[in-house]
Amino acid sequence: IYADAGSNLIPSFLKKLNKEIKVVSMQLTIDDTVYRCYDDDIDVEQFSKNFYQMMREDRNIYTSQVNPDDFIQAFKEDVDAGHQIICFTLAKGISGTYNSACIARDMINEEHGKEIVYVVDAATAGFGEGLQAIHAADLVEKGWDFKAIVEEAETFKFKVRSEFTVGDIKYLIKKGRVSSLVAKFINLIKIKFLLKGSLDSKIEVSGKVFGRKI
């Protein structure tokens, strides 16, 4: 079982779970510094605290989608060992990572003349994706076969619902999800968007609330 770094399945967490899930790294750029998510030896908890502070400081922060060659190299050991692979990715509506994984899948399957790699569009992001990978890993441990796990994964993903709010909507504006005029009004009256993953693999507004209670 594989997932991309958008799954929030950090190495220490997977070690505690004792799950056989392999995470394909993703590139994170902060100003002029480039990190390989989960590959670089960093304190994830401390880095997360600094990361959100840097977001509030409006630093130049962005991620780069995993490219097809990254997936091919990540899969190589298991492909060479004759294993079949199920890979979960960020929702295709918010990242090109799914398409990259599909390109890698097609190249590997065509080369071997049979289905070795199957890619699941998680239709969500963050731990919603991670939860799906964990569920699939559980089924592997129970002895389910490849086809049965694939069928269950495609059903189970619609049982996972991810909802969240954002502290600042500037990133929604950058993505064109909110107009600058509406944004000014929202900031003025302190509205928070309630967001969710949609069934067509996009992020959509599900509601609006005033303030945030912690």
Predicted regions and their residues:
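An N-terminal domain-start capping segment
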Residues: 1, 89-97, 177
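Short catalytic-loop micro-motif centered on adjacent basic/acidic residues
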Residues: 1-2, 62, 87, 119
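N-terminal glycine-rich anion-binding loop in soluble enzyme alpha/beta folds
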Residues: 2-70
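Mixed-charge interfacial surface used for oligomerization/domain docking
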Residues: 6-22, 27-33, 97, 101-106, ...
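Hydrophobic residues in alpha-helical segments
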Residues: 54-55, 79, 140, 173
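Glycine-rich phosphate- or other oxyanion-binding loops that anchor nucleotides, phosphorylated ligands
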Residues: 56-91, 99, 103, 150
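Short glycine-rich or small-residue beta-strand-to-loop segments that form or flank ligand, phosphate
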Residues: 84-92, 118-121, 135
